[in-house]
Amino acid sequence: MQPITTASLTPAQQQAVRVLAQAAEQADGIEALSEQTLLNLDLPEQPGGRGVKHLLVESPSGMDAYAQVDGGSVELVVAPQRRQRGIGGALLDAALTEGRQVWAHGDLPAAQALARSRELRRVRDLWVMTAEPPTDPDEPAASEGLRVRTFTVGRDEDAWVELNALAFAHHPEQGRLTRADLEQREGQPWFDPEVFFLAEDVNTGELLGSLWVKIEGNSGHAVGEIYALGVHPQAQGRGVGTLLTAHAMAAFAARDLARIELYVEGENTPAIRTYRRAGFTRARADVQYARP
């Protein structure tokens, strides 16, 4: 069956993809599509813009499969009841005419087999690390020349986007976030500026770092995430990250969380070592595959 390719989705199609992703998550025990992919469902067609493409496999019974291509990166999901019929392979083949790499969240055996069948190679590991919520974290200590405050909606967007681009200049996803991307996240139910911490120079007011906390779920079952920790390249070594992390841990301790988690590149050995010392362990890896 030939997937339908479109630059935007109707509201009904957007909802059908979300239902499909939820069904796959329930079947597999892991989210099928990333947050950015789900946010992209709502995007209108953008001539000359990001150029997100949607590939759909529909039948009278509903949405059988879905893939998205964004910046050369592919994510896809197949309905649990429609698997083992060649749909995933056909969809991947079509998506890879537009994209270059494909993500496998959790790197499940079926995804590994599909990658092997297309002679794709493993090119990137993104670890998910988790830890028990802190109960008695250290008080954030004063740091010479630095102060920490929280994000102000309507005032800090442009400065944060500039800082983020510098801090993540070599990161293929985080570093390209725009003000529109930030504002889209500000509209999400989980967004809370009170746990969006900014470190700035006490003399100039220049932003030197940020730590964005994301908390989702009901009390007792909620998950706290170190969503994005970035430090200005010229502020490296000043203790900015340590100071911001202390504020995040205090915020986690003040809430009734089931666990805390973060994402880190599998090749970032120094960061992984630091997180392990802080009590984090690897829970899973999301893997990116590409053609040789």
Predicted regions and their residues:
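A conserved beta-strand-loop-helix scaffold within acyl/acetyltransferase catalytic domains
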Residues: 36-47, 53, 61, 67-72, ...
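Acyl-donor-binding surface of acyltransferase catalytic domains
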Residues: 63, 70-75, 79-146, 289
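Short, high-confidence coil segments that cap the C-terminus of an alpha-helix
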Residues: 52, 97-99, 257
